[in-house]
Amino acid sequence: MAMATTSLSLLLLFLSLLTPLLAHPTPLQPSPYLSPPTVVFPDYHKMTTHFKIYTYDPPKSFHFTTPPETKFHNSLLNSQFLTRNPNEAHLFFVPFPHDFSTRQLSRFIRDLRQNFPYWNRTLGADHFFVSRAGIAYAPDRNVLELKKNAVQISFFPTTSGNFIPHKDITLPPLHSNPSPLALPHAPANKTASFLGFMKLDVKSQSQSQSQSDKSLVQEMEGDPEFAFASEPLDLGESRFCLFLYGGDLTWVGEAMRVGCVLVVITDRPIQDLPLIDVVRWSEIAVFVGPRGGVGELKRVLSGIGDERYERMRGLGVVAAQHFVWNATPQPYDAFYMVMYQLWLRRHAIRYARREWV
């Protein structure tokens, strides 16, 4: 009953946030979700009451060492989703440390194959695992099945080649000092002092960035319409918050919460966005390539009219709650939305259920 009340409350909040956007109705009402809210919320509620996960014992005692992995793993172990009965499980969790060699990982999967019946039923397709950088293809049969069939949960952005779209999931970035959730109907950002803000990051200047990215950043640093700082302290001073794909993306959720519209700078399509099965990213973010320089960037951003800007800003505030990692998971936060993505994958492979002895 409490969860149902929460679902209704969130739906009402969603509608209240969109009221000013719907003053002039359009054929398709704006929503940050790929499916209508009337579909997403009831299905989410069903997930919270029905979804079951069975976790294997790890091959050795270990702890995840990074905050996003630790948050997800601890939340999972203390959640209502775990079951001790593998026959009622929808999915199976395969825990192993990030420093496992290919040979060690192969032996672990081999042992699961030999000691339990569940892997062989689907060749691992109803299993999932956490790997910060993802795992690469390998000629070993066990590792290959894990790579190709099991759902991988990794960091965003992922290592090139280690992510399979429509199967794998990325964790929403974790920001260490999030601000309170932006209030509904936050005033329009028309008096912003800057067109865009970008966080200065040493990693963003590393060799991993393309020359086009570096050139664009250098041009922006010399343009008074863009602000730079080592920490995103007052994002309300800028209409847009700019991110280099591959750079520091930990404050994506923070930007959305305060109503700063996201701009992702990338020279290729992005297929590993967090919550990509749930959130309609084209409604909350602008994607632009770096090759046109600061002139093209300003042309794209200046071409976004007030109506579209306010719609993106409002929808970003709605979606921001799904990027918050709480010490104790709360409905619709990052942990629950990662679980919802797993829930959506429970029917990827169907098989005849029967009792296994």
Go through each PLM region and give its residues.
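Conserved catalytic-core segment of nucleotide-activated headgroup transferases in glycan assembly
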Residues: 175-230
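Short, solvent-exposed loop/turn segments at secondary-structure junctions
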Residues: 59-61, 97-101, 134-137, 176-177, ...
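C-terminal amphipathic helix plus adjacent low-complexity
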Residues: 2-7, 21-29, 47, 286-357
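Eukaryotic intrinsically disordered and solvent-exposed regulatory patches
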Residues: 38-40, 78-81, 114-117, 178-182, ...
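Catalytic core of nucleotide-activated saccharide and alditol-phosphate transferases
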Residues: 110-191
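Extracellular/periplasmic catalytic domains that process cell-envelope and extracellular macromolecules
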Residues: 45-48, 84-90, 121-124, 184-188, ...
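Catalytic binding pocket for nucleotide-activated donors in carbohydrate/polymer assembly enzymes
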Residues: 230-323
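Extended catalytic core of nucleotide-activated donor transferases of GT-like folds
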Residues: 2-7, 21-147
